[in-house]
């Protein structure tokens, strides 16, 4: 079929450019240092291409995205990068893909309780680093980690998203450093081996 014969609307991917982008990002963040976000591509085929390049850890914004990745066998290390209080959805995810390693973001006692009730075993403490959307204030990160551990959860570390800086045109590098300093401070309170942050718009500025 020729491209002009495709029914529209149609999503067309230039595989040569895609592979070049994967290789470029992988050179900066090799292997599991890069955690691709499923909401950006919503395709298990593309996820498999990333996994074949060594990027076997993924995150998603919804329970459904994680379930889709796990169903495709891409379940080594999945992060639900969103705070969920719907216990039923969490329980359905855990029960549906029992072999998957699933980590959930938490930022409050309520989300910690939901994680426990939903059968989640591991969490990251989500920290607000400048974008007023979600995440605890950095000074509360240690307290929340203690609460999560007291409830029997494994706390793997912290996550934060400097989304407000993705298109910043003035002093982006300095502002990214400020945001990441908040995340690193929170990690100092929380511990763990994961510090998750960054995005396409700031990846060249993140050197932590």
Predicted regions and their residues:
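Structural preference for beta-strand elements that scaffold enzyme active sites
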Residues: 33-35, 56-57, 77-79, 101-103, ...
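Active-site beta-loop-alpha junctions enriched in small/polar residues
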Residues: 41-43, 63-64, 83-85, 107-111, ...
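Active-site loop/helix belt of alpha/beta enzymes
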Residues: 120-122, 128-208
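A charged N-terminal "starter" segment
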Residues: 1-95
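Distinct, well-ordered alpha-helical segments
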Residues: 46-50, 70, 89-94, 112-120, ...
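Conserved, mostly hydrophobic/aromatic
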Residues: 18, 39, 69, 115, ...
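A general structural detector for well-ordered alpha-helical segments in enzyme core domains, enriched
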Residues: 21, 25, 46, 65, ...
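A generic, well-ordered mixed alpha/beta core segment in the N-terminal half of proteins
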Residues: 79-80, 86-133
């Amino acid at each position: 079929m020729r491209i002009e014969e495709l029914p529209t609307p149609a999503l067309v991917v230039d595989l040569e450019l895609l592979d070049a982008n994967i290789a470029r990002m992988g050179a900066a963040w090799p292997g599991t240092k890069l955690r691709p976000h499923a909401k950006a591509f919503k395709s298990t085929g593309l996820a498999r291409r990333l996994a074949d390049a060594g990027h076997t850890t993924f995150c998603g914004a919804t329970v459904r995205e994680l379930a889709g990745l796990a169903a495709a066998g891409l379940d080594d290390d999945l992060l639900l990068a969103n705070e969920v209080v719907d216990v039923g959805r969490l329980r359905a995810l855990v029960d549906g893909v029992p072999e998957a390693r699933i980590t959930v973001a938490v930022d409050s006692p309520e989300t910690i309780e939901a994680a426990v009730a939903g059968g989640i075993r591991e969490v990251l403490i989500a920290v607000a680093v400048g974008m007023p959307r979600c995440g605890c204030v950095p000074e509360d990160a240690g307290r929340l980690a203690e609460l999560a551990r007291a409830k029997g959860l494994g706390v793997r570390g912290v996550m934060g998203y400097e989304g407000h800086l993705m298109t910043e045109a003035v002093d982006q590098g300095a502002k990214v450093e400020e945001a990441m300093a908040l995340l690193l401070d929170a990690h100092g309170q929380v511990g763990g081996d994961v510090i998750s942050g960054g995005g396409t718009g700031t990846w060249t500025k993140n050197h932590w």
